């Protein structure tokens, strides 16, 4: 939503709020003599999008209040009143009863104002020893920690779907490609497990990213810490943080943990985009390897015959959106002096959008993949084209004592002969093959078969059905 659209949408609400609230923000307006410009209120407000952080803001405030009581800055009664008030506010947020105010700018002041209205002046004590600067970055870390866990689970669900499909299609032969040209026969199950492995590394990156997310900045206050005798380790314990940020300037000013997540998300989307591209190609009439289900496709308003692969196309397109969010935040951060600057308000929308986009793409892929129809015969027949067993013939000659470079040359000539006579290598007679090298014997035809080519690659990580089955077995253990 543009700021101009926001202004038009909320102008009436803002005027109504202005009639029943003072014109200068009470949370910071002590040194101001003029009210904030009407448009600037909307231009500078973040409540349009940061209200998603409400549960985390309240979670952080409850932990902060508990710590304040334990160090003697709140009484037991004050702490209890604050926590009960915050719990009521959380309930209002969840049920939709909470009334968000643009004049209160952001999530923090909206919740604090409601708390003060509920419990009186005791609510004003909650902000002791903290700033919105360390409060917001704590909220983001709590939010992102949960989202990383959710995304990890979505990836593992997709991995399970891929492993199941790979197991069904272990013996399904398809052409493996380089430069989008048929190269060698592979198992379709092996191809699916390639994406399983990519996603496995994505999970590792998320796990590693989570370590740096899980560091608590609360207690950094505005930038220099606080004069109160707070116990940051206690607050970290209450919030489940593994460590605390050891430099208050760094704690409030950097967003590298968000950038790291966006980078990881971009890599995940890149993997999904590559997969999408292949599904789009395979479902085309030119390849005809798979049939996408009607429920994941749409048609054309003018061409009755069309069945468009919208879901993989959208995932491919949304990859650019996530890349853009990463670039956006890198650009926002690149020239900021320490510590906090208002620029950092722009960190949230790229983050929230990336989280929502990534989760949606993972979910739709996990739902779609099991419903795809595999056209095994078409895959097999396509593999028979393009001389995909040429390397096998070269390896055969090497095993007969010919140096590989010489074998490569011999097979190249035999392929040229096959092209001229419109025959695959497996369709050449023994006499025709022996014309290129006398060491070729009748056993070559097993080597030149697609099944023979597949079975010959029987080592760890290769495409033989036996190795694919072992890979799936190992992969399933990582999902437990």
UniProtKB/Swiss-Prot annotation:
Keywords, sorted A to Z: Amino-acid biosynthesis, Arginine biosynthesis, Cytoplasm, Lyase
Catalytic activity: 2-(N(omega)-L-arginino)succinate = fumarate + L-arginine
Pfam families: ASL_C2, Lyase_1
One Gene Ontology cellular component: cytosol
Coiled-coil stretches: none
GO BP terms, alphabetized: arginine biosynthetic process via ornithine; L-arginine biosynthetic process
EC number(s) on file: 4.3.2.1
Tagged with keyword Amino-acid biosynthesis: yes
Xref: InterPro entries: Arg_succ_lyase_C (IPR029419), Argininosuccinate_lyase (IPR009049), Fumarase/histidase_N (IPR024083), Fumarate_lyase_CS (IPR020557), Fumarate_lyase_fam (IPR000362), Fumarate_lyase_N (IPR022761), L-Aspartase-like (IPR008948)
Pathway: Amino-acid biosynthesis; L-arginine biosynthesis; L-arginine from L-ornithine and carbamoyl phosphate: step 3/3
UniProt GO MF annotations: argininosuccinate lyase activity
Subcellular localization(s) per the UniProt record: Cytoplasm
HAMAP family (UniProt xref): Arg_succ_lyase
UniProt record similarity statement: Belongs to the lyase 1 family. Argininosuccinate lyase subfamily.
The protein, known as: Argininosuccinate lyase
Lineage: Bacteria, Pseudomonadati, Pseudomonadota, Gammaproteobacteria, Candidatus Pseudothioglobaceae
Gene that produces this protein: argH
């Amino acid at each position: 939503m543009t700021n101009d659209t926001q202004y038009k949408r909320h102008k009436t609400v803002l005027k109504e709020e202005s009639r029943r609230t003072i014109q200068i923000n009470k949370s910071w307006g002590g040194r101001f003599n003029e009210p904030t410009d009407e448009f600037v209120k909307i231009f500078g407000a973040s409540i349009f999008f940061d209200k998603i952080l409400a549960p985390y803001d309240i979670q952080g405030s409850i932990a902060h209040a508990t710590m304040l009581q334990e160090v003697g800055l709140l009484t037991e009664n004050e702490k209890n009143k604050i926590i009960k008030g915050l719990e009521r506010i959380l309930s209002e947020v969840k049920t939709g009863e909470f009334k968000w105010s643009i004049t209160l700018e952001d999530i923090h002041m909206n919740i604090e104002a409601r708390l003060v209205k509920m419990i009186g002046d005791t609510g004003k004590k909650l902000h002791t020893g903290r700033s919105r600067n360390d409060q917001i970055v704590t909220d983001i870390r709590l939010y992102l920690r949960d989202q990383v866990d959710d995304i990890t689970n979505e990836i593992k669900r997709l991995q399970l779907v891929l492993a199941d499909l790979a197991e069904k299609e272990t013996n399904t032969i398809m052409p493996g490609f380089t430069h989008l040209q048929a190269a060698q026969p592979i198992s379709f199950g092996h191809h699916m497990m390639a994406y399983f492995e990519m996603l496995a590394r994505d999970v590792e990156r998320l796990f590693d990213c989570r370590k740096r997310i899980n560091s608590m900045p609360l207690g950094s206050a505005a930038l220099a810490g606080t004069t109160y005798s707070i116990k940051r380790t206690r607050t970290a314990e209450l919030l489940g943080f593994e460590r605390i940020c050891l430099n208050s300037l760094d704690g409030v000013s950097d967003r590298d943990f968000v950038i790291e997540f966006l980078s990881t998300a971009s890599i995940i989307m890149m993997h999904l985009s590559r997969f999408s591209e292949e599904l789009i190609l395979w479902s085309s009439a030119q390849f005809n390897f798979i049939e996408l289900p009607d429920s994941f496709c749409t048609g054309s308003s003018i061409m009755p015959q069309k069945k468009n692969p919208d879901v993989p196309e959208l995932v491919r397109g949304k990859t650019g959106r996530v890349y853009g969010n990463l670039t956006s935040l890198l650009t926002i951060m690149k020239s900021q002096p320490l510590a906090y600057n208002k620029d950092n308000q722009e960190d949230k929308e790229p983050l929230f959008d990336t989280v929502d986009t990534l989760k949606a793409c993972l979910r739709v892929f996990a739902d779609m993949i099991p419903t795809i129809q595999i056209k095994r015969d078409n895959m097999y027949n396509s593999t028979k084209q393009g001389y995909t067993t040429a390397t096998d013939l070269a390896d055969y000659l090497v095993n007969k004592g010919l140096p590989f470079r010489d074998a490569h040359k011999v097979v190249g000539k035999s392929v040229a002969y096959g092209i001229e006579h419109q025959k695959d290598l497996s369709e050449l007679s023994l006499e025709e093959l022996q014309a290129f090298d006398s060491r070729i014997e009748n056993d070559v035809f097993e080597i030149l078969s697609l099944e023979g080519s597949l079975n010959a690659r029987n080592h760890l990580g290769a495409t033989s059905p036996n190795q694919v089955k072992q890979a799936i077995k190992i992969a399933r253990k990582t999902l437990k």
